[in-house]
């Protein structure tokens, strides 16, 4: 599963692909798309924790994530959990991605995952994600062409590409 998640994560660096990879928003239901969100959220869901969430909040989740068996555990591999959160962070680099995650209950899943997460690196990534999901969207930030830079693990600054004025 790690190779698939890593490939998906690499693909999510292409902001223009976010509209294709997420189900259409309520505003544009006729737009063709895939729906990767359930595949990203499902490993982050713990069935017992989800059962305690309000029914109204559960209904905002993608359909595949709503009726989860109470015995379903969260992904055990911390490296995979981190990559999944980073995938969500990359989706937040476009306005469409942020709106889709908000409308489809991603916050509910990461909120519960944050409470149970023992690894500090993953909790920090979740906090960055929550800050992007909960921030106020001004008119200036609502444009898809405006860049939101999100740093993810493994993204190192290449000193050879830095131009310095002398």
Which functions belong to the PLM regions below?
Residues 2-6, 28-35, 75-83, 105, ...:
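Residues within HEAT/ARM-like alpha-solenoid scaffolds
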Residues 43-79, 122, 133:
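Acidic, Ser/Thr- and Gly/Pro-rich intrinsically disordered linkers and low-complexity segments
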